[in-house]
Amino acid sequence: MPRALWTAWVWAVIILSMEGASHQASSLSCDPTGVCDGHSRSLNSIPSGLTDGVKSLDLSNNEITYVSNRDLQRCVNLKTLRLGANEIHTVEEDSFFHLRNLEYLDLSYNRLSNLSSSWFRSLYALKFLNLLGNVYKTLGETSLFSHLPNLRTLKVGNSNSFTEIHEKDFTGLIFLEELEISAQNLQIYVPKSLKSIQNISHLILHLKQPVLLVDILVDIVSSLDCLELRDTNLHTFHFSEASISEMNTSVKKLIFRNVQFTDESFVEVVKLFNYVSGILEVEFDDCTHDGIGDFRALSLDRIRHLGNVETLTIRKLHIPQFFLFHDLSSIYPLTGKVKRVTIESSKVFLVPCLLSQHLKSLEYLDLSENLMSEETLKNSACKDAWPFLQTLVLRQNRLKSLEKTGELLLTLENLNNLDISKNNFLSMPETCRWPGKMKQLNLSSTRVHSLTQCLPQTLEILDVSNNNLDSFSLILPQLKELYISRNKLKTLPDASFLPVLSVMRISRNIINTFSKEQLDSFQQLKTLEAGGNNFICSCDFLSFTQGQQALGRVLVDWPAEYRCDSPSHVRGQRVQDARLSLSECHRAAVVSAACCALFLLLLLTGVLCHRFHGLWYMKMMWAWLQAKRKPRKAPRRDICYDAFVSYSEQDSYWVENLMVQELEHFNPPFKLCLHKRDFIPGKWIIDNIIDSIEKSHKTIFVLSENFVKSEWCKYELDFSHFRLFDENNDAAILILLEPIDKKAIPQRFCKLRKIMNTKTYLEWPVDETQQEGFWLNLRAAIRS
């Protein structure tokens, strides 16, 4: 019994483990190229069943705690492995041994407390390694990265427990494109720890305090291109000139991101610019200046310039004591060599005239997303200000008058590129004055409704996208590039206005078509972006766009952004794929063919009507319909005649001289209705026939060869037949005046054939001795 229980328990464990493995494998989604996505699936282990077909595996943001030797042993072709943001605390020694093709490994933000070089000893192809955010204190007792000759990006450290950097830590790394070290609580830096790396393109340091910053600079200043300092409080920073004054430096760019300065530490940073002579570019991003800008008492006057700094970028600068800030006149002399200045989102409302005049080498000035207005711009662009300025960016400020803005910039004689986008100009005056060398103008997102001759004729590049323009009719003879997307244009501009245009971007308007002739009229056009419009996919438009193989070289967003808006059955389809029917594309030909077919049909109908008496049948149909509208049975008081006599005019002698004499002069007499005598003059003959038949008790048909040839006799026969069959009575009396062969009766007298087949008829005897009996039978038939 215990053995049976043990066996059952083992099988239950096996089944549950198989179900778990199946569930985890199903948590992965893999495409045919071997890219598997399993991030954010609440996995607690690496799914089993992974094969050599997996090229990329993303298991980030799960609950994985352990990586074993078997988990990835079959993934020999794996190139990308993401295990970040898990709970991994243990990685077995040979877990990555089989991943010889691995190029990207992310183990960041786990719970690894110890790092082992054995993890990486077979990863010769590894180019990217991220170990940030784990809980280790050091990078291990031996060199971690000595077996990674192709490593180009390395991220190590954490914000709390990583406290030591030793000389062995980066041994074996010769060249890195990017090295990021998160060491906010760094306490020990052994000199020359970073010196083993002969070349670093970009070093990112997260340091809370600058205590060890100079020691690190000493080691890297000769092998580094760009140093980025993040999340650092430089209040106590002090630069020692003796440290690096005699060393060959290669640092070209300094970036301070989320760094705090004081007036004193800012001066120390400026000293650094002087002594690290290779620095060409300095960037301050989201920094805070905890001071009032009073540098006069801080020996700043002994610094003559900012070294070789040519580019200065400041974004989102915070100055808590802004309203106590000094005029910065003490730093004016330092700016003479600066060529490019960017100050974005820093609440700048004025550049003092004196500072503008000191910026004698300035070629590029970007004051985007600030508070500049025409009133302050007048002071900033004063006489002799920015004498060599070529590009001025005033995007998203508080400018309102285009005319005034142009006049204020007349002092900038070398200005050729002006960006005043995202200002609320709303309207444009008829005339404006601009610097004489203006070649580029950006007026996008300025809410203008129309363009006027205010724009300078010297323009080569014009951007008026994202406005309310519904037409473009300006003559700009030198314009080469036009950006006019996101407006309300209904057609392409006239090419005669823009004779040298080579680039036009006119997407997201309400253009519904353009033709080959329009494109050909732009003789120098090389690039056209016209997608996102509401195209009417007419036959001509489709023929042009689908038939021009070279069109794709001009239309840069072809074919993805070109979609039909109408006709409705192709709406949403790509213009390249839309197809119209023959009737839509050749309407004139189809209409002509239809008319010809209709004419032939009418002609054929006419021939058939003539051949088969169609016109006669139509007349009879009309007469029958008229008869159908009459009451089905006349009331008794409307019966005026004993019999209506239907006969041919050629048989009138027999009817009038024999029948009338025998019936109307008999005692009691019969009252007959004859068309010659009793039809009402002026009344339509069809109505006379119908009324006479309906007012007669019987209808007598005098049949002869002449009868079957008579049209009116046929009408009378039809109406009588209507009463005979539709009213279900016995009103018809047939008199055969002469023998008639039934086969000789025309087909159109079908009713006569039916009556002769269904009713007994009286035959007029030639023998006079039998004629008395004929009249007796006829009188009896009328009375019945």
Curated annotation (Swiss-Prot):
Its ancestry begins with: Eukaryota, Metazoa, Chordata, Craniata, Vertebrata
- Name where it's found: Membrane; Cytoplasmic vesicle, Phagosome membrane; Membrane raft
GO CC terms in record: Golgi apparatus; membrane raft; phagocytic vesicle membrane; plasma membrane; receptor complex
Recorded GO terms, molecular function?
A: NAD+ nucleosidase activity, cyclic ADP-ribose generating; transmembrane signaling receptor activity; triacyl lipopeptide binding
Q: So what family is this one in?
A: Belongs to the Toll-like receptor family.
**Domain LRRCT positions:** 525-579
Q: How does the record comment on the protein's domains?
A: Ester-bound lipid substrates are bound through a crevice formed between the LRR 11 and LRR 12.
Q: Where do we find the motif ATG16L1-binding motif here?
A: 761-778
Q: Which residues lie on this side of the membrane: Extracellular?
A: 21-587
- Name of protein: Toll-like receptor 2
